[in-house]
Amino acid sequence: MKINGNEIRPGNVIEHEGGLWVAVKTNAVKPGKGGAYNQVELKNLINGTKLNERFRAAESVERVRLEQKDFSFLYEQGEALIFMDTETYEQLELQKDFVGDRAAFLQDGMMVTVELYEEKPIGIRLPDQVTLAITEADPVVKGQTAASSYKPAVLENGIRIPVPPFIASGERVIVDTNELTYISRA
């Protein structure tokens, strides 16, 4: 579907320079001299590279609709992650580097959304929040209450995040998978 350059919004996926790009940020610019344009920060869906482009209002670009399917995470096999389509029960194998650092958050039976373009997976979305146990946390130092301070803690999946001083080893916490930050106690 063709759209004008000034209609590109964050989250839109477009075909540009022979690749698929997602708009991360957009900024409509109206200079005093010359025509208005849309300054767009793009991220390549395949290799993750970023690009800044200007699109004039008269320019048209191809907007791509991605198919989104729900999959359930089954298990890990070496460098491969195995998922199952919840509708057809077909299995899908993705490499760990496709998922990236967030692969550590995958748990048995976790529901994820896989984005497909022409039946080929190009992206994966994990739940925004997961509940994990703290395996290691520094003890609280008395008298550090003047300012809010966070201490480092290690989650059961090995990822280090800052947590409030009252969190101890063994407690379960809710973690934001996008920002890798503590949200609350579970």
UniProtKB/Swiss-Prot annotation:
Keyword field contains Ion transport: no
Function, as annotated, reads: Involved in peptide bond synthesis. Stimulates efficient translation and peptide-bond synthesis on native or reconstituted 70S ribosomes in vitro. Probably functions indirectly by altering the affinity of the ribosome for aminoacyl-tRNA, thus increasing their reactivity as acceptors for peptidyl transferase.
Q: So, what pathway does this thing act in?
A: Protein biosynthesis; polypeptide chain elongation
Which Pfam families does the annotation name? EFP, EFP_N, Elong-fact-P_C
Annotated GO biological processes are:
peptide biosynthetic process
Compartmental location: Cytoplasm
MF (Gene Ontology): translation elongation factor activity
Q: Which gene encodes it?
A: efp
Cite the CDD domains for this sequence.
S1_EF-P_repeat_1, S1_EF-P_repeat_2
What InterPro entries does the annotation carry? Answer: Elong-fact-P_C, NA-bd_OB-fold, Rib_uL2_dom2, Transl_elong_fac_P/YeiP, Transl_elong_KOW-like, Transl_elong_P/YeiP_cen, Transl_elong_P/YeiP_CS, Transl_elongation_fac_P
Q: Which family does it belong to?
A: Belongs to the elongation factor P family.
Q: What is this protein called?
A: Elongation factor P
Cellular component, GO annotation: cytoplasm
